[in-house]
Regions:
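Phosphoinositide-binding peripheral membrane targeting modules
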Residues: 51-109
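Canonical pleckstrin homology
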Residues: 98-130
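Anionic N-terminal interaction surfaces
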Residues: 1-64
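Low-complexity, intrinsically disordered/propeptide-like segments
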Residues: 16, 37, 48, 52-54, ...
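Context-gated lysine
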Residues: 3, 19-20, 66, 107-110, ...
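Hydrophobic alpha-helical membrane-spanning segments
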Residues: 29-46, 66-68, 72-75, 80, ...
Length: 130
């Protein structure tokens, strides 16, 4: 029989997973092409929260994923790279997908939603980085 978690336990587990992913990406170098693309959109990756980053899977863009910008926007990005690891012209996508995330601080029976938990983790990590 699987263990049933309370809403508070589920929230704590989700928040811990978000922190773990964010800390993992903050501890590793991100592709220069992604840094440059983010900078061109006014996003400093050192203060952003990388939620997902995939690199060079067959039949997929060379770099793609999701992040939460320092100003609270959820972004989906993707780009193909040339042999010098620069974005190929016309291959860069940078889309604000914030509308897809529920930012409710509390929903009856469900607690804080994923988008709100991401924002809390972003604030916590950026406070501790100062």
């Amino acid at each position: 029989m699987s263990k049933q978690y309370s809403v508070q336990q589920q929230i704590a587990l989700t928040q811990a997973a978000i922190k773990k992913t964010a800390a993992w990406w903050r501890a590793r170098p991100l592709p220069d092409a992604l840094r440059q693309c983010a900078a061109s959109h006014g996003v400093t990756l050192d203060a952003a929260l990388v939620l997902d980053l995939q690199l060079a899977w067959p039949d997929m863009p060379a770099v793609y994923g999701k992040l939460l910008s320092p100003d609270g926007h959820f972004i989906h990005f993707e780009m193909d790279l040339d042999d010098d690891l620069r974005p190929l012209p016309g291959s860069v996508a940078w889309d604000d997908i914030s509308a897809r995330y529920d930012l409710a601080a509390h929903k009856r029976g469900k607690g804080a939603r994923y988008g709100e938990l991401c924002k809390q983790v972003l604030q916590e990590l950026n406070r501790s980085a100062r």
